[in-house]
């Protein structure tokens, strides 16, 4: 896939300074440069019209300007990255069907092809207002893990539901495997959600008016707010699970080790 086949799109990297599990993780050193700089540089490779770092803290602003990034300062009271994204879209006056990609600031090795496939998926589905990514689950253990978010889709590859629960359910198969180990059956349609989001600017403009849904509150999954409102979410399929991001200091050490082996 080449960038010539892509529609125009913008990338915003929400970069919150405070993190409950790993404070200041975006400024942590990874192979001689901050985690955030890795993310910014991979975003540049995607061929977007613009790449913007959105932050609420002057230390991140200073660091980002230092490595040549475009920065927009945002409020510090946002509940999530989508709210920060919506503020940037309004400030930049992006409107209508303009496509905006949310690339998380703690994903230094996100494959660029996932950005491309999700942008193309949204562009091709004119009824969808946002898109995301999923890949196949093959391990039974992952299927039953509540930290692995699952998604089921309709025949147009639009999301029907996201859940921490195992779905869809193999009524007969799981009854015969009480240990919940091993591999899922070949062809079993279990999909793991990957947290990359692509929006039309028109959806971001009305995001603040969308109330939190009961489903979102129970599952702790922000994307359920959109499904609850009847918003169509297109799901692009990835060939495999990308390298894990930086959620904890242990994650960072793993990436440092992999980088030292040149295995990323």
Swiss-Prot record:
Which keywords does this Swiss-Prot/TrEMBL entry list? Cytoplasm, Lipopolysaccharide biosynthesis, Nucleotidyltransferase, Transferase
Query: What is catalyzed by this enzyme?
Result: 3-deoxy-alpha-D-manno-oct-2-ulosonate + CTP = CMP-3-deoxy-beta-D-manno-octulosonate + diphosphate
Cell location: Cytoplasm
GO BP, one example?
lipopolysaccharide biosynthetic process
InterPro entries per the UniProt record, alphabetical: Cytidylyl_trans (IPR003329), KdsB (IPR004528), Nucleotide-diphossugar_trans (IPR029044)
Report whether Nucleotidyltransferase shows up as a keyword of the record. Answer: yes
EC no.?
A: 2.7.7.38
Pathway listed for it is: Nucleotide-sugar biosynthesis; CMP-3-deoxy-D-manno-octulosonate biosynthesis; CMP-3-deoxy-D-manno-octulosonate from 3-deoxy-D-manno-octulosonate and CTP: step 1/1; Bacterial outer membrane biogenesis; lipopolysaccharide biosynthesis
Which portions of this protein are annotated as coiled-coil regions? none
UniProt enzyme class: transferase
Q: What is its main location?
A: cytoplasm
Show the GO MF annotations: 3-deoxy-manno-octulosonate cytidylyltransferase activity
Recorded superkingdom: Bacteria
Q: Name one GO cellular component term.
A: cytosol
Which Pfam families does this chain map to? CTP_transf_3
Q: Which family does it belong to?
A: Belongs to the KdsB family.
Q: Function, please?
A: Activates KDO (a required 8-carbon sugar) for incorporation into bacterial lipopolysaccharide in Gram-negative bacteria.
The protein, known as? 3-deoxy-manno-octulosonate cytidylyltransferase
Organism name: Marinomonas sp. (strain MWYL1)
- Gene name for this UniProt entry: kdsB
């Amino acid at each position: 896939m080449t960038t010539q086949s892509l529609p125009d799109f913008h990338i915003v990297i929400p970069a919150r300074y405070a993190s409950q599990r790993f404070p200041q993780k975006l400024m942590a050193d990874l192979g001689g440069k901050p985690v955030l700089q890795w993310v910014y540089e991979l975003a540049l490779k995607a061929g977007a019209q613009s790449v913007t770092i959105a932050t609420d803290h002057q230390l991140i602003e200073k660091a980002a300007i230092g490595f040549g990034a475009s920065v927009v300062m945002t409020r510090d009271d946002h509940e999530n990255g989508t709210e920060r994204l919506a503020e940037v879209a309004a400030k930049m006056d992006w409107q209508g069907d303009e496509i905006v990609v949310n690339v998380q600031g703690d994903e230094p090795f996100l494959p660029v092809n996932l950005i491309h496939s999700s942008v193309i998926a949204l562009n091709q589905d004119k009824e969808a207002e946002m898109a995301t990514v999923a890949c196949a689950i093959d391990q039974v253990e992952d299927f039953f893990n509540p930290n692995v978010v699952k998604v089921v889709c309709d025949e147009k590859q639009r999301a029907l539901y996201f859940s921490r629960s195992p779905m869809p359910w193999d009524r007969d198969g799981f009854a015969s495997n009480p240990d919940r180990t091993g591999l899922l059956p070949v062809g079993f349609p279990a999909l793991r959600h990957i947290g990359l989001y692509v929006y039309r600017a028109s959806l971001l403009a009305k995001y603040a008016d969308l109330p939190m849904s009961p489903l979102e509150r129970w599952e702790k999954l922000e994307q359920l707010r959109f499904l609850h409102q009847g918003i169509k979410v297109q799901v692009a399929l990835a060939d495999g699970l990308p390298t894990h991001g930086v959620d904890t200091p242990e994650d960072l050490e793993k990436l440092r080790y992999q980088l030292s082996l040149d295995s990323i």
